Amino acid sequence: MTEIYDFDKSAWDIKGSIAPIQPTTYSDGRLVPQVRVIDPGLGDRKDECFMYMSLLGVVEDSDPLGPPIGRAFGSLPLGVGRSTAKPEKLLKEATELDIVVRRTAGLNEKLVFYNNTPLTLLTPWRKVLTTGSVFNANQVCNAVNLIPLDTPQRFRVVYMSITRLSDNGYYTVPRRMLEFRSVNAVAFNLLVTLRIDKAIGPGKIIDNTEQLPEATFMVHIGNFRRKKSEVYSADYCKMKIEKMGLVFALGGIGGTSLHIRSTGKMSKTLHAQLGFKKTLCYPLMDINEDLNRLLWRSRCKIVRIQAVLQPSVPQEFRIYDDVIINDDQGLFKVL
C-alpha cells in the first residue's frame, strides 16, 4: 500500500525556482553568451568561493574554411572549483576555449571532451578541461545521433551555469544506499512536481502560468525499518518525516538538481543510510536525463513535493539494469 504525504509549500518557497536563460542573438544570428548564477544554499559556509560550473553550448563542425554547421546542443559539467573571479570574466574565458568533441562508445554511447587552450581563470577546473573527460552521451547531448564521425567537431560555449555551494557540509549521497532494500522496511521516496517555462525569447510573456507544462521526478531518500520483525505504520513514518524539518531548493549541479537539507531531528538509522549527512543533492542528470536536458535553459519552479511511503522492494526481487535477462540455456554469456 502506498501512502502520500504533502509537504507545506513553505519548505521550498525561498529557493525553489531557477530563472531561465533567455536566448538573445547578434545581428548575424549567433547566440550572445550569458551566465546564470544559482545559490540553493542557506549561506552558512564560511568560505563562499566554492562553486559548481557547467558549460552549455553548440556541438558544431570544426571547419576553419567556412561557417560552422551546428549539429546538436550539449552540456559540459566541469565540477567543483574555488574562485573569486567575477562570473562574467569566467564566461569570457570559457567562450575562448578550443574544446574538441569526439563521439565514441563503451557500455553506451559516449562523448569525449578535451580543451587545447591554456587556462588562467578556469585553472580550478583544469582536471576536466586539460586531461579530458568522457560522459554518457545522452546525459550531455540532446541529439548525439546527429554528430558525425568523419568531420572534426568542436564545442562552442554560449552559456555558463554556476551553482554557489554556500551550504556548510557535503552534498553526496552514498549510491549503494539508493538501491538498498530491507525486509519489513518502509521506503521513503519524494515525488517532486516542477512547472516548466521554456526560454522563448525576450519580451514574450505567458499570461496564465497555470497553463505551463508540469513534470515530475522521483528520488529515494532511505528506509524506515524497525529492529523487530514488524513494520512501521504510515502515520508513524509521517511523524518522523515532519521531525526532520526538510527544506528544499533547486540548483544547477549537472544541469538541474534537487537540494535537500534537514533542519530537524533525523532517525539514527536513516542518518547512517545517508552517510551521516544532512545536506543532500540529487542531480537530475543521474535521476532523469531526459527531463534534465529539457531544463538546461528553462525556468522551472517547484509546485509540489510529496513524501511517498511504499513497502521496500523485497530482496528476492532482482533488479535488472540490463536488457538481456539470462536463462538456463547459456545463450548470453558474460565474457
Curated annotation (Swiss-Prot):
Lineage, broadest ranks: Viruses, Riboviria, Orthornavirae, Negarnaviricota, Haploviricotina
Keyword line: Host cell membrane, Host membrane, Host-virus interaction, Lipid-binding, Membrane, Viral envelope protein, Viral matrix protein, Virion
Gene Ontology biological process terms in this record: fusion of virus membrane with host plasma membrane; virion assembly
Name of the protein in its database record: Matrix protein
Subunit structure as annotated in this protein's UniProt entry: Homodimer. Dimerization is critical for virion formation. Interacts with host ANP32B.
Lineage: superkingdom: Viruses
Keyword Transit peptide recorded: no
Keyword Membrane: yes
Cell location: Virion; Host cell membrane
Annotated family: Belongs to the morbillivirus/respirovirus/rubulavirus M protein family.
Task performed by this protein: The M protein has a crucial role in virus assembly and interacts with the RNP complex as well as with the viral membrane. Associates with phosphatidylserine (PS) and phosphatidylinositol 4,5-bisphosphate (PIP2) at the plasma membrane. Interaction with PIP2 triggers matrix protein lattice polymerization. Matrix proteins induce host membrane deformation and curvature necessary for virion assembly/budding.
GO cellular component: host cell plasma membrane; membrane; viral envelope
Gene this protein is translated from: M
GO MF: lipid binding; structural constituent of virion
